Amino acid sequence: MDKFVIRGGNPLIGTVRVSGAKNSALPCMAAAILTEDEVILENIPQVRDIETERKLLTSMGAEVELGYGRAQHRTTISCRVLSDPTAKYEIVKTMRASALVLGPLVARTGLARVSMPGGCAIGARPIDLHIKGLEQMGATIVYEHGYIEARAERLKGAQIHFDKITVTGTEDLMMAAVLAEGETVLENAAREPEVTDLAALLTAMGAQIEGAGTSEIRIQGVEKLHGARHRINPDRIEAGTFLIAGAITGGDLCVSHCNPAHLGAVIAKLEEAGVRIDVLGKDSLRVRSEGHLKPIDVSTEEYPGFPTDMQAQYMALATQAEGTTLVKENIFENRFMHVQELVRMGANIKTAGRIASVRGKTPLSAAAVMCSDLRASASLVLAALVANGESILDRVYNIDRGYEHIEEKLRGVGAQIKRLGNVFNDKREAAQISAS
């Protein structure tokens, strides 16, 4: 099992490039199910979840080509033949986004069998909002042997109100609705950039969608969709993670190939904390910090508020602020699993329910820590970058689910970080980073 060895203390200086958004790419790959034609997606990140989605689609009979190169990360998907509309447990057990094939499958084939999804263990992300919406559209749902089976001759348009804002639920039902008979209205819909990115692809495929990016989305169903070419949005969470990496290390970092418009809440909090951020053109940000950080409270919200996927990283930064920072998690319960690992590194953090109190400025010391989920893992990387000594991060496959070659990107801007695989016990490997 791979590990990271990180020696802290180096300011990050230089330019780091942001990859395509995993959380945009996954629903866009699922959208290829809706047509017999080829769908070409560009700016696909090279991360573990994308490979899992490829396996999922090919297990259904699709043809999926993934190509990675310096200039272009691209996938070509053909779902002309879907021989088995089943999302098998052995594939989807590691990825929550597998639920996104439910809507497209029942819309295109009239049948979907999807195992209850897996992914990060950060609280309840109920699929019941997907199910309720599909039932309103006329689908018959059966739960059997750990699978959700949905059937419908053709889905019917419906007015669907989400009791709770759900990104994957909005995406799943938007995909289901594009081939439904009549108009579907999604109320209290998610407004995230990943939703608008999916809507842009679906529109390019011939769908009729209005209001994506607002709380009410209207979809007029069509008989058939065609193929399209689409470029995936930059990953706003990866970009935000690098902004904090520059700030926490007291560096001077340019974060390129991002979309500053998608980072408003993150930028605002960092600037309040005393971090200097400059917009360089339409797709780059420069972050500078001299290490004097103010304690600024944060409360996670749905977009355009402060993203829950940046909460753990912000908490790592808060350990270096001069005072007490309150962090409130409003989206998911049980999303403080990184706290105990940060405490192992010397952080002074106390939790009560959904609120964490972070007292700084705390000198962090290197430790062996466990990566529990994707964003918690990112927070540990950030903490290790400023910790005194050499930290060892175990189970970094959680990082690989959503960050493309993060160790190579960080090493390129001055971090002392090395990936160790099964040869971890070889002292010569560990010594390489100690001597660098």
From Swiss-Prot:
UniProt xrefs under Pfam families: EPSP_synthase (PF00275)
Superkingdom per UniProt: Bacteria
First-tier enzyme category under EC: transferase
Annotated active site: C120 (proton donor)
Binding of phosphoenolpyruvate, residues: K22, N23
KW NAD (keyword) present: no
Classification via InterPro entries: Enolpyruvate_Tfrase_dom, Enolpyruvate_Tfrase_sf, MurA_subfamily, RNA3'P_cycl/enolpyr_Trfase_a/b, UDP_GlcNAc_COvinyl_MurA
Predominant location category: cytoplasm
Cellular component terms (Gene Ontology): cytoplasm
Species in which this protein is naturally found: Acidobacterium capsulatum (strain ATCC 51196 / DSM 11244 / BCRC 80197 / JCM 7670 / NBRC 15755 / NCIMB 13165 / 161)
Family: Belongs to the EPSP synthase family. MurA subfamily.
Protein name from the UniProt record: UDP-N-acetylglucosamine 1-carboxyvinyltransferase
Record GO biological process: cell division; cell wall organization; peptidoglycan biosynthetic process; regulation of cell shape; UDP-N-acetylgalactosamine biosynthetic process
